[in-house]
Amino acid sequence: MEKPEVVRSLYNDQFKILESILKLHVEGNTFDVDLTYGNGAFYKKGIPQPKHRLDIDDSLENITKVCDSTNTGLQAASVNSVVFDPPFLTYIKKQRTGNSNMVMSRRFSGYWTSDELSEHYQLSIKEAARILKHKGIMVIKCQDIVHNHKLFCTHAHILNWSSEFFRLKDLFVQAATHRMPAPNRRGTQKHARIFHSYWIVLQRWAR
């Protein structure tokens, strides 16, 4: 009799992590809601499409609703699972109308300041808590960054921001197999180059 494959906390393949999370923590074979669907990269290798495929970019195909992840318009306590894969880079100016234009920054792959990133993440977590049923699952993919010459430990901040609404259920690390995006700056290196990202599994807990 074959032993079942052991689910590990570390993979270099995001599809293995997604499959592991779905196997261990999500009812059914996919998520109910993808808050930041994009081009649907999570579903390229056989994971079924979510019922609610949301994104702020109205030029994308296959989304079910154009909306901000902080204001989905879905009913309160109506879904069992949510996945959130927001931008993680700062100092992104591409196609912005101003350095503080948070909506435009999310649409074009990054934020200008860490405050902008923090605001978007916190409001999206609060919205996910609103639409999830008690004991529902929220999955967040994130990466720590160096911002303004300081390490911004995004995954630790997420745990703090979510603690009012969620319990930590599981944590996966994805090791990069290629060079990950980073600001293009010259000068002496001050921090270790980041070659991993986190997948945080949270469980909604109505207090």
Segments and roles (model prediction):
Residues 1-207:
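Class I S-adenosyl-L-methionine-dependent methyltransferase catalytic core
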